[in-house]
């Protein structure tokens, strides 16, 4: 199996085993997301969700395990493969949104395509289509440092979609949005996943996001999977007090 060179082809599934040591505990997460599938990762603060995102994105190295997109190897600790983020072919939105502050929303969204060699005009046109899709067309010329939290989050999502990623890894991408914008942007993401046949790993605190988007949900606590199944299955038999609180039921053992 060879290391990936550039973006993996659209239509490939994501297969990963993430082992990352974190002080008193370690993340140990196995996930498989088919092309066009959505896996939602839920859990309390400090449970390992953002560490999983960082490991998938190439922001922290694996102590053991691998990340594969189809037949392409993005990381393999045993084989010494660890591609940098820009070579993984992923569309990533981090919980702490990172935009280039002095660039406009349009320039931020077009940045990846320009860096890949696309000419300025088509890159801008593509960026404008995505900004319109996420409801940010009126702020295309606004510098990123002047965007509100919700606007910056939508710009970051548009930037992730703009590079035609082979997979999406989104960490709390709707957290700063109001209810109307949240539903609209969720629909944009769902349409992209369905039409482009890309796998999506969605980290969220909101069960509604998981119910609306995900085929499968897993719950992480202290780096370990404590429950896995279809979104509606969580309410039937919550495995921990956190899951019971999430679904609005009595605690385990009550």
Model-found features: residue ranges?
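Conserved ABC ATPase signature
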Residues: 143-147, 151
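ABC ATPase NBD coupling module
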Residues: 74-91, 115, 234-238
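Conserved ABC ATPase "signature" region
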Residues: 72-76, 121-139, 190-191
